[in-house]
A protein has these predicted regions:
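Glycine-rich nucleotide/cofactor/substrate-binding loop typically near the N-terminus or early
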Residues: 36-106, 112-115
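Glycine-rich loops and low-complexity Gly/Arg-rich segments
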Residues: 33-36, 62-67, 132-136, 181
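Short alpha-helical segments and helix-capping/turn motifs at coil-helix boundaries
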Residues: 21-28, 88-98, 139-141
Length: 185
């Protein structure tokens, strides 16, 4: 499974996404032959990319609790992560944009905390990278659009009401700066 296609671009490399979302992708690989990997992107300059890459994306998940009325106390090595990018370094930003234009990309996942989905008028789309998460997402989506690639599924996991609608509102505000109108549905 080491060379599986990178189907997921994930903004956020914290415990929640790695223990929940990446776990489910790991199970999909094992039980449903999904055959996919996740590329993580650290959402802020101080992040975990170096540590995750030193471990080749592998980490152990401890599952404790109950399932179907039975006690669970399991360990599982998660292997669904291929690498983690630091977009605050020139090469990491380039790699993020390469993944954005990939034919393999199907899903973008995010958890940049409840403070992450905010429109920042000081954020510039020509910055490398844009300073806000919605700005980075706009860069990725616009790059994908210009490359003529198909649409993707967006899973916003931030803990705010209407997280997807709020994120869409921010992205549309950034698109208006480059004179791209909102998509029609």
């Amino acid at each position: 499974m080491k060379n599986a296609p990178e189907k997921v671009l994930q903004f956020g490399e914290g415990n929640f996404l790695r223990a929940f979302v990446d776990y489910w992708f790991d199970l999909a690989n094992e039980k449903a032959d999904w055959n996919g990997k996740c590329v993580l992107v650290q959402p802020i300059a101080p992040g975990l990319a170096k540590m995750i890459n030193e471990q080749e994306g592998l980490y152990t998940l401890y599952l404790r609790g109950s399932e179907n009325g039975k006690k669970v106390d399991d360990k599982r090595v998660i292997s669904s992560v291929s690498r983690c990018l630091n977009p605050y370094e020139e090469e990491g930003f380039k790699q993020m944009m390469d993944v954005a234009a990939s034919d393999d990309l199907e899903i973008i996942v995010s958890n940049t905390t409840e403070a992450g989905i905010v429109y920042d008028p000081a954020c510039k789309l020509e910055d490398v990278p844009a300073s806000s998460f919605p700005g980075k997402l706009t860069q990725v989506l616009y790059h994908r659009y210009k490359a003529g690639k198909k649409g993707i599924i967006m899973l916003a996991c931030e803990l705010i009401d209407n997280n997807g609608k709020e994120l869409l509102k921010c992205v549309n505000q950034y698109l208006s700066l480059i004179h791209i109108s909102e998509p029609t549905r």
